[in-house]
Regions:
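A conserved SF2-helicase RecA2
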Residues: 1-25
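Core catalytic lobe of class I
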Residues: 24-192
Length: 192
């Protein structure tokens, strides 16, 4: 009956609140527990907080690094206070990200490269004051240049707009929007 369903729902909510409320009890914020390292012939893979790991690496020892940074404050990646993606805004994010760029510059051999996966980020009228796109890749390039790096090149990774539309439900990708008002249409957002 409906009364039984309501009672089960209420009990389930109570249990969920109790379980979530106790989630952090007994957990220590121990940065050491996130560190790990694997090696093979001519390669080393580090796992851990990138800034903390980079601090442990000797100067001028890395030939090539590749990674995807947090996309500013677009997603919450973890509950860690150390996570640079847990930022209130772009300024705070780039202040934190700058520490990594400095460390990577220190540990990278002169003339060698780092490859960064990123993409343009959506702007929302409620949060950003206007709807559109932020040039996140350009912001990364400018920040890296301010830390001593030289921009080498950009590779565009094409994304299927139909798949993006199905995933994001963005009206700017719909054919009916093109017919209705093409000024509000856009192509799929590439990665870089």
């Amino acid at each position: 009956t409906i009364k039984k369903k309501e009672a089960r729902h209420t009990e389930m909510k109570r249990e969920m609140v109790a379980m979530i409320g106790g989630f952090h009890k007994g957990r220590e914020l121990n940065q050491e527990s996130y560190f790990g390292c694997d090696t093979g012939d001519d390669w080393t893979l580090h796992h851990g907080d990138c800034v903390e790991v980079a601090k442990r690496i000797e100067d001028d020892t890395i030939g090539f690094s590749v990674y995807s940074p947090p996309f500013s404050n677009l997603y919450i990646y973890s509950d860690s206070a150390y996570d640079m993606g847990n930022s209130a805004n772009d300024d705070e994010f780039f202040a934190h990200y700058g520490y990594l760029a400095e460390q990577l510059y220190r540990i990278t051999k002169p003339g060698r490269l780092t490859a960064i996966h990123c993409k343009d980020l959506p702007m929302y009228k409620g949060r950003d004051g206007a709807a559109g796109l932020k040039d996140f890749p350009g912001d990364i390039i400018r920040m890296y240049e301010s830390k001593g790096w030289q921009f080498h090149s950009r590779v565009t990774i094409w994304k299927d707009p139909v798949i993006e539309m199905q995933r994001t439900k963005n009206h700017g990708l719909l054919y009916k929007q093109l017919c209705k008002d093409s000024a509000a249409s856009r192509q799929g957002m590439a990665d870089y």
